[in-house]
């Protein structure tokens, strides 16, 4: 296995159409639509990019996938019923800016009834309150927890974990910003560079990202100071935008 190897877009698309024909031969009328997503769907694939496809099925509760490599290239094909796919497209979790970009750049390969457009419209039409709730949950479930971790490191170590924790905090901050602006990042590799270009960032976020993007993660004191500044910036930013985190003085159940 010596891959992935360099391939052209034309070579990838030839494979896509071979897979499409195999899907139609195997599942026949059960197939409603087939599309390509990811960099290939956006037409921004690089020489080593993989192939990602989605298949909308008429079978209720269909939900399975195939992922394989030939040793030279890799493919993932997800099979979902229309109901399951639409439900997932309407969900907003903390990683929505990374997971749901697929629904905004689907390249249709086979679509007998406009199903992929329906998926796109569903993802596009999520209510503002859903994003609001996801932001509040991210602050509590991820960022608040990370703050406890870096404060523990300041008190008792180990500082060896601080560089990777700083990367995690920067990524969580990017998810916060993506949810606020309701944008999906192009790729996981471009998350931070795209996040810092957005308007209305929490104070301290850009400075924190500079450490991560430059790889300057060896000075523990500077990292801890930057993390605290970002956390303070989040407090002011959330209050300004009305993201009220529920605080319970008692056990809530």
UniProtKB/Swiss-Prot annotation:
One of its GO terms (biological process) is response to antibiotic. GO terms for molecular function: nucleotidyltransferase activity. Keywords: Antibiotic resistance, ATP-binding, Nucleotide-binding, Plasmid, Transferase. Mg(2+) B binds at residues 50, 52. This is Aminoglycoside nucleotidyltransferase (4'). It comes from the Bacteria. Inactivates aminoglycoside antibiotics such as kanamycin by catalyzing the transfer of a nucleotidyl group from a wide variety of nucleoside triphosphates ((d)ATP, (d)CTP, (d)GTP, ITP, TTP and (d)UTP) to the 4'-hydroxyl group of the aminoglycoside. In vitro, antibiotics without the 4'-hydroxyl but possessing a 4''-hydroxyl group (e.g. sisomicin and gentamicin) are also modifed but with poor specificity. The 3' position of the NTP ribose ring does not tolerate large substitutions (e.g. ddATP) and dNTPs and TTP are better substrates than their NTP counterparts. It catalyses: amikacin + ATP = 4'-adenylylamikacin + diphosphate; kanamycin A + ATP = 4'-adenylylkanamycin A + diphosphate; neomycin B + ATP = 4'-adenylylneomycin B + diphosphate; paromomycin + ATP = 4'-adenylylparomomycin + diphosphate. SUPFAM superfamilies: Nucleotidyltransferase (SSF81301), Nucleotidyltransferase substrate binding subunit/domain (SSF81593). Pfam families: KNTase_C. InterPro entries: KNTase_C (IPR012481), NT_sf (IPR043519). Residues 1-127 are annotated as: N-terminal domain. Although some of the cross-references in are mapped to other bacteria, they are probably all derived from the gene originally encoded on plasmid pUB110 in S.aureus. ATP binds at residues 39, 42, 49-50, 52, 145, 149, 187. Its EC number is 2.7.7.-. Transmembrane segments: none annotated. The active site is at residue 145. Gene3D superfamilies: Beta Polymerase, domain 2, Nucleotidyltransferases domain 2. Residues 128-241 are annotated as: C-terminal domain. Its cofactor is Mg(2+). Bilobed; the N-terminus has a 5-strand beta-pleated sheet while the C-terminus is a helical bundle. Homodimer. It comes from Staphylococcus aureus. Mg(2+) A binds at residues 50, 52, 145. Thermostable at 50 degrees Celsius for about 14 minutes, at 55 degrees Celsius for about 2 minutes. The gene is knt. The keyword Transferase applies.
